[in-house]
């Protein structure tokens, strides 16, 4: 079973999935909508769950370096509450601090228009990699 990483945005939401072994993550897609609508994003997630056999969802949580919440933090927390009502899977937060900065650095050579279309799925990949490397692997070692 695979993991799904999400970089949630009001307009653009990036998705990434793990490979079958949960060792690496791959950018999947960027979902674009005209305004923030949880239902549209949840429908997109349900499609991904059916297609890729997902067993865990990881959402990037934007927290300032001093652990202070922002409007974006509250938006993401509210989304998780809505998602939990619709989907019966474990859902984790991963601090996404700097994921967009790292994503932009990794695609720095691309033209700005193309970069805008993929930065969110690269951010989702970074979020999912963080989970796989720091949480999921630790959990596996703790079981043995």
From Swiss-Prot:
Supply the SMART domains for this chain: YqgFc
Which GO molecular function terms does the record list? nuclease activity
Q: Matching Gene3D superfamilies, A to Z?
A: YqgF/RNase H-like domain (3.30.420.140)
Keywords attached to this Swiss-Prot or TrEMBL record, sorted alphabetically, are: Cytoplasm, Hydrolase, Nuclease, Ribosome biogenesis
* Pfam families linked: RuvX
Q: Which Gene Ontology CC terms are recorded?
A: cytosol
Query: Does the UniProt entry include the keyword Nuclease?
Result: yes
The places in or outside the cell where this protein is found are: Cytoplasm
Record GO biological process: rRNA 5'-end processing
- State the top-level EC class: hydrolase
Listed EC numbers = 3.1.-.-
- So what does this one do? Could be a nuclease involved in processing of the 5'-end of pre-16S rRNA.
Give the HAMAP family listed for this entry: Nuclease_YqgF (MF_00651)
Question: Can you tell me which family this protein belongs to?
Answer: Belongs to the YqgF nuclease family.
Q: What is the protein name for this chain?
A: Putative pre-16S rRNA nuclease
Organism taxonomic ancestry: Bacteria, Bacillati, Mycoplasmatota, Mycoplasmoidales, Metamycoplasmataceae
């Amino acid at each position: 079973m695979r993991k799904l990483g999400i970089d949630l945005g009001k307009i653009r939401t990036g998705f990434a999935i793990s490979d079958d072994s949960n060792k690496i993550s791959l950018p999947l897609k960027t979902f674009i909508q005209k305004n923030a609508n949880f239902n549209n994003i949840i429908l997109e997630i349900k499609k991904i769950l059916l297609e890729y056999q997902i067993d865990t969802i990881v959402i990037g949580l934007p927290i300032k370096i001093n652990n202070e919440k922002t409007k974006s933090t509250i938006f993401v927390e509210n989304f998780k509450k809505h998602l939990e009502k619709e989907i019966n899977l474990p859902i984790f937060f991963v601090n996404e601090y700097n994921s967009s900065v790292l994503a932009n650095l990794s695609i720095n050579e691309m033209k700005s228009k193309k970069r805008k279309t993929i930065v969110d799925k690269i951010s989702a990949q970074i979020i999912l990699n963080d989970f796989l490397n720091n949480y999921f692997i630790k959990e596996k070692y703790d079981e043995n």
